[in-house]
Amino acid sequence: MPPNNVDIVREAYDAVNLGDLDMAVSCIAPDMEYVASGAVPGATGVFMGPEGVKEFIAGLYEEFDEPHADVSELLDAGDQVLVSATARGRGKLSGVEATWDTWQLWTVRDGKLVRGQGFTSREEALAAAGLDR
């Protein structure tokens, strides 16, 4: 049985947590778009395709030693998956451990991530998924 959308998103998070850029990129479509909310320090803007995703992930590893997202929820919303996570990492310059809550909404098509968007609140993410009603 092919993986479901939640499994695909989980695999992508596992890859990023491991720092495995090749594995992370294998989960995305060539024309994938990720819109960063700025919830992650230093990560704001739109990142396109495999190179954009690599740039985003590499930025995390430039800012933090061993960045990690502890996923607490993966909510299946049809072709979308809402992720709630607590991210953490030790600042490379400051040495200070940072943690922050984060939410992303992922769209999956044909077994690949085609769009992702970060949010600074669960309410915003639920509204974007049409689940706030």
Predicted region positions:
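C-terminal and inter-domain tail/linker signature
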Residues: 1-133
